[in-house]
C-alpha cells in the first residue's frame, strides 16, 4: 500500500522570533538606503526574500543593527516587545522627519504554554516581500529628504522587561500633524507585524 509523507510548516516561538528580528534588520537597512540616510556606495546588494536587498557596509551601523536584532529576538521570544520605531531626524536640528513604526502582536498562548503554530515559510516570505517592495518604492510616496539625516531606534516593551544598559529611556520622538501611510503586514501566526510610516507634512506648515 502506497504511503505519503506530508510535511507541515511548524512555527515555534524561537523560530518566529528569529524571522521577525531578521526582518527588522533587513527593513532597517532598506529604509536607511532608500531614504538616503547613508550614501548609496556604502551598501552592497544581497538576495533575501527572493528580492535584491541592500546591506550597509558601514561598520558602526552593521554593529548597531546586529546588536539590535539580537536584542529584539530575545524580547520577541519572551513576548515582551510591543513596537519598534525607526526614527529619521535632521542631523542639524534633531527634528523628527519620519517614523517607521512596526507594531507587534504576540500570541500569548504560545509564550505561556510553549505550543507551536502552522504556516508555510513561502507564505510568510510573500508577506515580507510585499513590505520590502513598499519600502523600496518609498520615494514615490514620501517627500525627499534633502538634508543630512541621522537615525535612532525606539523599542516599546512591557514594563517588567530587563533593559540592557546600552538602551536608554527616550521621549517618543513624535511628529506634529504627521501624514501617515499604512504598509502591508506579515504574520508568522505567533508574531503579527503591522507597518506604518508617518512623516513631516510640510504643506501643513505652509498653510
What do these predicted ranges mean?
Residues 1-57, 62, 71-207:
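Long protein-protein interaction modules used by eukaryotic assembly/scaffold proteins
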Amino acid at each position: 500500500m502506497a504511503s505519503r509523507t506530508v510535511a507541515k510548516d511548524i512555527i515555534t516561538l524561537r523560530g518566529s522570533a528569529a524571522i521577525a528580528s531578521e526582518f527588522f534588520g533587513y527593513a532597517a537597512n532598506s529604509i536607511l538606503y532608500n531614504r538616503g540616510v547613508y550614501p548609496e556606495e556604502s551598501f552592497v546588494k544581497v538576495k533575501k526574500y527572493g528580492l535584491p536587498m541592500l546591506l550597509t557596509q558601514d561598520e558602526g551601523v552593521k554593529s548597531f543593527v546586529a546588536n539590535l536584532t539580537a536584542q529584539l529576538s530575545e524580547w520577541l521570544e519572551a513576548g515582551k516587545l510591543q513596537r519598534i520605531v525607526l526614527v529619521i531626524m535632521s542631523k542639524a536640528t534633531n527634528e523628527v522627519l519620519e517614523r517607521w513604526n512596526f507594531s507587534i502582536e504576540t500570541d500569548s498562548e504560545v509564550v505561556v504554554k510553549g505550543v507551536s503554530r502552522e504556516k508555510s515559510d513561502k507564505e510568510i516570505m510573500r508577506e515580507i516581500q510585499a513590505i520590502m517592495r513598499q519600502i523600496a518604492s518609498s520615494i514615490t510616496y514620501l517627500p525627499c529628504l534633502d538634508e543630512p539625516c541621522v537615525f535612532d531606534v525606539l523599542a516599546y516593551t512591557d514594563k517588567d522587561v530587563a533593559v540592557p544598559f546600552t538602551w536608554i529611556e527616550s521621549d517618543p520622538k513624535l511628529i506634529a500633524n504627521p501624514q501617515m501611510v499604512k504598509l502591508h503586514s506579515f504574520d508568522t501566526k505567533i508574531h503579527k507585524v503591522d507597518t506604518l510610516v508617518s512623516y513631516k507634512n510640510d504643506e501643513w506648515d505652509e498653510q
